């Protein structure tokens, strides 16, 4: 009974929890990272790609429109 729950918890963490945290981290740090940190970010995207693919229909990464004041 405990083994299926463990597998379910690990699958949920791999497919949902960590990718959501990774998306927030990428959004905050994308334009201000060093080259070493960017390499680490690419590694995390490669590692958690299935979870990012699951979340991709629900994520909007387009930049917000600029407000031009006249």
UniProtKB/Swiss-Prot annotation:
Intracellular or extracellular location(s): Cellular thylakoid membrane
For membrane topology, the record states:
Multi-pass membrane protein
Query: Top-level EC class, please?
Result: translocase
Q: EC number(s) of the enzyme?
A: 7.1.1.-
The organism's superkingdom is given as Bacteria
- Reaction catalysed by this enzyme: a plastoquinone + NADH + (n+1) H(+)(in) = a plastoquinol + NAD(+) + n H(+)(out); a plastoquinone + NADPH + (n+1) H(+)(in) = a plastoquinol + NADP(+) + n H(+)(out)
The protein's matches in InterPro entries, at most eight in alphabetical order, are given as:
NADH-quinone_OxRdatse_su_L
Question: Membrane-crossing residues?
Answer: 2-22, 39-59
Q: Which HAMAP family match?
A: NDH1_NDH1L
Name the protein family: Belongs to the complex I NdhL subunit family.
Keyword annotations for this protein, in alphabetical order, are: Membrane, NAD, NADP, Plastoquinone, Quinone, Thylakoid, Translocase, Transmembrane, Transmembrane helix, Transport
- Broad class of where this protein is predominantly found: membrane
Q: Which GO terms describe its molecular function?
A: oxidoreductase activity, acting on NAD(P)H, quinone or similar compound as acceptor; quinone binding
Biological function: NDH-1 shuttles electrons from an unknown electron donor, via FMN and iron-sulfur (Fe-S) centers, to quinones in the respiratory and/or the photosynthetic chain. The immediate electron acceptor for the enzyme in this species is believed to be plastoquinone. Couples the redox reaction to proton translocation, and thus conserves the redox energy in a proton gradient. Cyanobacterial NDH-1 also plays a role in inorganic carbon-concentration.
Task: Provide the protein name.
Answer: NAD(P)H-quinone oxidoreductase subunit L
Entry's Gene Ontology cellular component terms:
plasma membrane-derived thylakoid membrane
| Taxon lineage | Bacteria, Bacillati, Cyanobacteriota, Cyanophyceae, Nostocales
Complex and partners: NDH-1 can be composed of about 15 different subunits; different subcomplexes with different compositions have been identified which probably have different functions.
């Amino acid at each position: 009974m405990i083994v299926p729950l463990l597998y379910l918890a690990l699958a949920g963490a791999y497919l949902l929890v960590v990718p959501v945290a990774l998306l927030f981290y990428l959004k905050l740090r994308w334009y201000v990272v060093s080259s070493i940190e960017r390499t680490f970010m690419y590694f995390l995207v490669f590692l958690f790609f299935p979870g990012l693919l699951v979340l991709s229909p629900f994520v909007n990464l387009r930049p917000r429109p600029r407000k031009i004041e006249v």
